[in-house]
Amino acid sequence: MPKVLVVATSRKTKGGITSVVKAHETGEQWKKFHCKWIETHRDGNSVRKLWYLATALIEYICLLPFYDIVHIHVGLRTSVNRKLIFARIALLFRKKIIVHFHPATEKHLFDPMFSGNIKHLFELSNKLLVLSPKWIEWINEAYRGNKYNIQVLYNPCPSVKRSIQRENYILYAGILSDRKGYNRLI
């Protein structure tokens, strides 16, 4: 079985990427593929952020020769810049690269200030994972003629045992926008 090095923000950081990686960590595939989580970022001041990045790079370079695949979870802006460093190193070591794209909005795909680094990260990947079919549309619109190997991977959620007797409640906590898919709940 190939071994997977997972590059993502810290377990102690709040947000979607941390939640997704924590959910994957509880799945059987985590053990099956001998996954190891490299924590590249933590909320806090600049010193803490630089410390996390520096220690993550050292750990990553030490472990990378023993792994086959690098699975990079990335958001936008600074996250893309950080993860480009890890992707370039993986390329030097001839590792397969999976980029798991978790952006908050599609607008940066079309913004010249950010789109170059995003495009470069996508080009380095062997597989690009996105959160919904809509993201495939936006990426294809932003980077026409791309040759990305894109696949949708929905965010995991824990299994829940349902009681036979239940009341009907709908709770939606989040931003009401089309990209979040609230219209599919109702």
Question: What positions do the PLM features span?
Answer:
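Membrane-proximal helix-turn-helix segments that form the acceptor-binding/catalytic region
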Residues: 86-93, 111-127
